[in-house]
A protein has these predicted regions:
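A short acidic-Thr-Gly-centered motif at the start of a beta-strand
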Residues: 45-55
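Single conserved hydrophobic/aromatic residue that forms the stacking wall/gate
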Residues: 1-12
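Short His-Asn-centered micro-motif
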Residues: 61-64, 124
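A structural-propensity feature for long, helix-poor, extended segments
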Residues: 95-122
Length: 262
């Protein structure tokens, strides 16, 4: 019964993609959350041998990777992950033409002139970055990219910011335009926004599923039936839009061990 409750709780959380994230910057440290502002960052720097962000790679998190729940799921309860606030200019965050291994319809950045999205940057050490590559299905589901148009909200080390871009493209709606995530704050949006339940229903209608499932039923089935999930992803390609001249540069990465994340 406990396992069933846990599975249901996870399903409910997955239906709430991209999950709750604290306002502002924060530090996830061994399962606990701490607010992180400029003064805190400077104080942390003074009491450590190395600065908090030293040796870490800044990775823009446009969806679930900005949330403590997902970071805990990916890195475990002993992980230390600094997360800083950022704005992404001239892009919106929209739903992909993809179904993730955890059952949600994930998101990706997409060019949108004048739009400013409120996002996070996760600062990953070398091992965390390699594991993040795996969980993103690097080279198959997502490309690793160097982003443009990122504005930090704290003073952080100068250098490029990286991220992930969906290789399958983004899901087209009735107007042949993408649909943004209602849960992600943005200014001057050009695209309509929808919630995860609406996206799951659209995927059901666009593919060969015989009925429109509830979002919980959709997620549970996608988590457990990989062959069906792969079939749906293939069918969604006829409804996918690829970005034209995106503001990022692909960095070729290939690695083994990604099958369980596809």
């Amino acid at each position: 019964h406990t396992l069933l409750r846990r599975q249901r709780q996870m399903c409910i959380r997955d239906s709430l993609y991209p999950y709750m994230a604290p306002e502002g910057s924060y530090l996830l440290a061994k399962g606990r959350l701490f607010q992180l502002n400029q003064r805190d960052l400077e104080e942390v720097v003074q009491v450590q041998t190395d600065p908090l962000l030293f040796g870490r790679t800044p990775v823009l998190a446009v969806g679930s990777n900005r949330a403590p729940y997902q970071l805990l799921r990916k890195f475990g309860s002993e992980a230390i992950v600094p997360v800083t606030s950022a704005r992404l200019h001239d892009c919106d965050v929209v739903h992909t033409a993809l179904v993730s291994y955890y059952g949600a319809i994930p998101c990706t950045a997409f060019p949108s002139s004048g739009t400013i999205t409120e996002l996070k940057i996760v600062w990953l050490d070398e091992d965390q970055l390699l594991h993040m590559h795996k969980t993103e299905g690097i080279g198959v589901a997502y490309d690793y990219v160097e982003m443009q148009g990122v504005a930090h909200q704290l003073e952080v080390p100068v250098g490029p910011v990286f991220g992930y871009a969906a290789r399958a493209g983004v899901l087209a709606w009735e107007d042949s335009q993408p649909a943004g995530l209602a849960a992600i704050s943005a200014q001057a949006r050009q695209f309509k926004t929808v919630r995860q339940g609406e996206v799951a229903q659209r995927v059901c209608k666009l593919t060969n599923l015989t009925e429109v499932w509830s979002v919980e039923q959709f997620i549970t089935t996608m988590q457990t039936e990989k062959i069906l999930r792969e079939e749906l992803i293939g069918q969604l390609q006829t409804h996918a839009i690829q970005p034209d001249q995106p503001p990022w540069r692909v960095i070729p990465v290939s690695m083994d061990g990604i099958d369980e994340y596809l």
